[in-house]
């Protein structure tokens, strides 16, 4: 992808000229690859949550072509680039952009990245390049968003969803964990006799409500340990939590007894945030 137009993984593409260019530039190439994966690590991705390794190739290409491999990891530099790179990673994972025909996907992206006029990582131009391809489109339909918000905590996609929602966090300097807002332990011990009717019991015990993105947040490692199984209302009040930054609905009762209202309101809130995050 770095040194020729045909990026297919074929023996014929590794001619003497390409091999020579790799040899001459190997230290910069290696450094670009290393810092790209270090960025993913800083953003909280691991081998489980970052399944489509091809998604890092455009980032490596951009870092190398802009010659920023020695500075991109510095906290105060290239903040907009890193924000857009992280957005690309999250949405490309959720949409399964590299689920098939990865060569054609990378060829399209290379055409965008080859533009010498780009000033920051060109997420919007990449999105536009796939706008007419339903299979690779980076847009999120209402139906898709509904499904995304049902993503379970242990799903490989869960971290990508939360990282997209919590795009305002300081990923370069803080490590974040997935955390239940209303503690999971409260739901696991419920019995039908705890409720006036079976429908309410079914709502509380449905994993699509209590164990999905609708009841999850990204919390710093230290805060997550201290929060433990504390009631949501108590945690918010005792720690003077900023509801807006935590993506918690305002002007509702956060008691466990009002969990259905919490889920309804948070679904509306997260839907708006997702649409805003992707520019729709």
Task: Provide a role label for each language-model segment.
Residues 57, 83, 87, 176-179, ...:
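Feature representing long, continuous alpha-helical segments
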Residues 172, 205-206, 279-280:
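Extended, charge-rich low-complexity regions and/or helical-solenoid scaffolds
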């Amino acid at each position: 992808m770095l040194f020729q137009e045909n990026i297919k993984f074929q023996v014929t593409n590794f001619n003497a000229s390409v091999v020579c260019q790799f040899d001459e530039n190997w230290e910069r190439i290696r450094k670009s690859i290393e810092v790209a994966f270090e960025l993913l690590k800083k953003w909280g991705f691991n081998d489980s949550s970052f399944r489509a390794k091809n998604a890092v190739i455009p980032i490596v290409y951009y870092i190398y072509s802009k010659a920023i491999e020695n500075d991109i990891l510095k906290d105060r530099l290239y903040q907009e680039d890193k924000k857009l790179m992280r957005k690309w990673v999250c949405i490309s994972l959720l949409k399964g952009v590299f689920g098939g025909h990865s060569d054609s996907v990378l060829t399209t992206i290379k055409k965008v990245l080859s533009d010498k006029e780009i000033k920051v990582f060109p997420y919007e131009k990449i999105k536009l390049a796939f706008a007419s391809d339903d299979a690779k489109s980076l847009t999120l339909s209402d139906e898709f968003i509904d499904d995304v918000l049902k993503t379970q905590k242990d799903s490989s996609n869960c971290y990508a969803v939360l990282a997209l929602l919590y795009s305002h966090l300081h990923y370069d300097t803080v490590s974040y964990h997935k955390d239940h807002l209303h503690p999971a332990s409260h739901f696991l011990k419920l019995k039908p006799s705890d409720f006036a009717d079976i429908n309410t019991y079914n709502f509380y015990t449905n994993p699509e409500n209590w164990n999905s993105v609708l009841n999850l947040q990204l919390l710093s490692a230290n805060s997550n340990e201290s929060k433990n199984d504390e009631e949501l209302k108590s945690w918010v009040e005792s720690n003077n939590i900023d509801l807006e930054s935590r993506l918690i609905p305002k002007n509702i009762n956060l008691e466990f007894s009002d969990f259905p209202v919490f889920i309804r309101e948070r679904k509306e809130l997260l839907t708006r945030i997702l649409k805003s995050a992707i520019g729709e």
